[in-house]
Amino acid sequence: RAISHPADDRDPGVDRHFFGWLAYVAFVVYGSLVPLDFQPLPLDQAWATFKQIPMLQLGIERRADWVSNGVLYVPVGFLTVALFAERRTLLTRLPVVVGATLFCFALAVAVEFAQLYFPPRTVSLNDVVAECVGSVLGIVLAVYWSEWFREMLATLTGKLGQLGSRVLQAYAIGYVAFSFFPFDFLLSTAELAAKVDSDAWGWFLSAQSTDRSAFIVAAKLFAEALAVVPLGIILARWNVVRRLPATRHAVLYGALLGLLIEVGQFVVFSAVSQGASLLTRAIGMYGGARLWADRKQLAELHAHAHNKVLTVSLGSLYLLALTAVNGWFDHRWHGMAFAARTLAETRLLPFYYHYYTSEQVALLSLASVALMYSPVGVLAWLRRWSPALAFWSAALTASAVETSKLFIADLHPDPSNVLIGASTAWAVSKLLRRL
């Protein structure tokens, strides 16, 4: 007879939650210290400097960085409460809420203090305040939404049904938040006037959107439409519940969504507003609704996807588009000597290049790379490959693309893209196998 030990009955999800929380906290610390240029400093001197860190007067150009620091800590507060305060009443969760608040504040102070040893990081009271505000906001959100979040995690681990609904809900929340990131809203009439006089908006296309080739502009518009497809699926499911055609009002609601977002983005300093986005969102909304209406045919497509002709054709078109958006056809190519110089200047540290740009550009870069390699996960799903094979296929593809940038003028390889692309392909393949 087997002897049962208390440890045998422990929920394995607890360990997964802890390591997931720990991974995000580690990411916050790592991202706050990149480029990891450690410079020794006596502790007493560091402490004396830290006690005198200033409260800076931030203009609108630096407001996005300040807000982004706070946004980075929202998940810290949220996850600390949502994953570890499993009791439902506020009173019984109060000790965890207090502990989470103290932990987040201590983390913010410790990270800012550590940045003294890692120039050129900037240390200021502004950052500490932003990180504490973000932590509190995350904790407040967890008080009201932690139950939904735990149910979402349960669906991903196979403990509950309705995985598709939960994923779509999470995507909708993320889509709206992403649309207004980094939340540097205009706060005065002078700032609004500056936005009106800028090239960050246009009745159809903004001047900022047309500074690259026509193919890149078309690819960006296509990505905008593609990003709304899951919202079209949500609309179609809602229509079906009400016994209406799946595509009912899809174009109208897509255009209205585009209008609301573009008007909202007009009062975000870092955002770009353009009329073409109404059209792309209308197309994306209708496309998502149509996909849901034709889901049986798509299931048949998956059933017959072992046909190599289909997947090879799709894969060839994908590789053509991938190489095009990565500058193969509109940039000059050079030889081995140029590649050797570029390689010598390349930094292999993950997310090194994200530090030397704004938070909005860094997030857009991450999202665009994820979108570029998500088709690898779809193709792997069609071919019934394992998620691990999807991961390595995307890693190999991204490595080839990044290596090619050694030979292309005005571009530089970023090893982070290999990690981002491979992880995205794995996640897409894993999710499609579960739906």
What is each of the regions a protein language model found here?
Residues 1-435:
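Bulky hydrophobic segments
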